[in-house]
Amino acid sequence: MDRIRIVGGNELNGIIPISGAKNAALPLMIASLLTSDTLTLENVPHLADVELLMRILGNHGVDVAVNGRRERQEDSYSRTIHFTCRTIVDTTASYELVSKMRASFWVIGPLLAREGHCRVSLPGGCAIGTRPVDLFIEGLTALGATMEIDAGYINAKAPAGGLIGARYTFPKVSVGATHVMMMAATLARGTTVIGNAAREPEVVDLANCLNAMGAKITGAGTATITIEGVTSLSGARHRVLPDRIETGTYAMAVAMAGGDVVLENTDVALLETAVETLRRAGAEISSTNNGMRIKRNGAGIRPVDIVTDPFPGFPTDLQAQFMALMTRSSGVSHVTETIFENRFMHVQELARLGARISLSGQTAKIEGVQRLRGAPVMATDLRASVSLVIAGLAAEGETTVSRVYHLDRGFERLEEKLTRCGAIVERISE
């Protein structure tokens, strides 16, 4: 099992290219099940989750063709991938596959819309609270589907003639359930109106791609999305938007370690709340023509309180990274997590580096310390793992992070991107 070794104390200076967003790429890939034509996606990141989903989609009958690297691709590793699903060969998504990756549960929407029935395993996946699937079931039931749970699987069936448009308001915001309902509704008869929809940029990205395929979706990015059903969708070409979580993560790494870095192929507008928070913490951030520049002068890190919220609030996927930054602030800060209940698994690991953090319910109180000291730590989930890397960049001496397979699910070439900016980060394969 690989580990990552970090020797702290170096500033970061240089350019970091930002990859395509994992959280956009996954639903976009699943959308290929909605058409018998080819969906071509550009800027697809090279991540463990993406590779796994390609295999899962292959099981349903999707042919996947990856363009080879082009000359002059230099620093960008982004890939163009063609997905073609002429016929769906299997409408069952097995436990073996869905348990490895939550997002693969989302195939339930397209399979139901295109084939009229499917059998999908209830998910296992990343250890963040319960993450119920009720919202998905209720949303699809509103479109006329019958859903029964049998031996850990959902047997879903559309009415004769296909799904029927309806009005449905989610009791709480769910990005995954918004994706699924939107995909299913594209082929439903009549109009669907989704209330309390997720407003995340990744939802907008999926809507833009579905519209390019011939869907009629308006209102994406607001709390109400309207979908006029069409009889079929065609192929399209779509570029995956930049990864705002990766952007925020590297911005926090620079704020932690100090230095001056340009993040390329990204957009400040995708994470305004997080950028504003970083500015309050003492980082200088400015837009560039294709990204943003982040600098931190030597004045230290100021304490800032945050509460995670659905978009446009502070993203839960940056909470751990921000907490790592706050461990070195000049005072006391509070981090309140409202999205996922056990998302503080990184706290005890940060404590091993010398952080002072106490928990009370959903809130963590962080007392900034003068210095962190390197130690062996263990990653518990994707975002927690990168928070340990950020802390390690500023810790004295050597930090080793084990279980880095979590990192590989969501960060492309992390050690390479940081090393190029002067950090000492290396992967140790055992």
Curated annotation (Swiss-Prot):
Output one GO BP term: UDP-N-acetylgalactosamine biosynthetic process
| Molecular function GO labels | UDP-N-acetylglucosamine 1-carboxyvinyltransferase activity
Provide the reaction this enzyme catalyses.
phosphoenolpyruvate + UDP-N-acetyl-alpha-D-glucosamine = UDP-N-acetyl-3-O-(1-carboxyvinyl)-alpha-D-glucosamine + phosphate
Q: Which GO terms describe its cellular component?
A: cytoplasm
Positions with a binding annotation for phosphoenolpyruvate: K22, N23
The 2-(S-cysteinyl)pyruvic acid O-phosphothioketal modification is found at C126
An example Pfam family from this entry, by short name, is EPSP_synthase
- Which InterPro entries does the UniProt record give? Enolpyruvate_Tfrase_dom, Enolpyruvate_Tfrase_sf, MurA_subfamily, RNA3'P_cycl/enolpyr_Trfase_a/b, UDP_GlcNAc_COvinyl_MurA
Q: Which domain of life is it from?
A: Bacteria
Entry keyword annotation includes Transferase = yes
Q: What is the uppermost EC class here?
A: transferase
CDD domains found in the cross-reference section:
UdpNAET
Record key words, sorted:
Cell cycle, Cell division, Cell shape, Cell wall biogenesis/degradation, Cytoplasm, Peptidoglycan synthesis, Pyruvate, Transferase
Main location per the UniProt record: cytoplasm
Its localization reads: Cytoplasm
Q: In which pathway does it act?
A: Cell wall biogenesis; peptidoglycan biosynthesis
According to the UniProt entry, what is the EC number of this protein? Answer: 2.5.1.7
Give residues annotated as binding UDP-N-acetyl-alpha-D-glucosamine.
R102, R131, P132, V133, D134, L135, K172, V173, S174, V175, D317, I339
Query: Where in the sequence is the active site?
Result: C126
- Family per record: Belongs to the EPSP synthase family. MurA subfamily.
Q: Which NCBIfam families match?
A: murA, PRK09369.1
**Record PANTHER family:** UDP-N-ACETYLGLUCOSAMINE 1-CARBOXYVINYLTRANSFERASE
Function noted in UniProt: Cell wall formation. Adds enolpyruvyl to UDP-N-acetylglucosamine.
- This chain belongs to which protein, by name? UDP-N-acetylglucosamine 1-carboxyvinyltransferase
Say which species the protein is native to: Rhizobium johnstonii (strain DSM 114642 / LMG 32736 / 3841)
